[in-house]
Amino acid sequence: SIDDGYYLYHPKNHSLLFLNHLEPYKEWKTAVGKQSHVVDAPIHFITVGDPRVISWKYESLNSIRTLWLEIGHLSQVIQMVATATDHLSRGISLFREDIIADNAGLDWRSFLWGMLIAVGPRDD
């Protein structure tokens, strides 16, 4: 089991690093635009990219393009796994990354924000 909170995936160690506890429900509701199918889901994946991590390799805008592609691939894989395990997934791209980042203890301007994917049991 895993405690509620914000976690950052560490690719070198293939582990989750705890960042912070979840913010109050009201702030989360505001951050996702009061979309009930997202607010009430038990699991949320937020796909982000950090240009600083790969800028040494791609010294141009290729690093940004590469991050967008990776964010897209990751979002697709999360949704495919949810479907394969008979769960419902819903992705949104309009959310308040500033609220989420602030509560997670991150500088929201340092990342490329992709999608927020809510995953939960099917309603049927």
Predicted regions and their residues:
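Acidic, surface-exposed loops and disordered segments
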Residues: 1-124
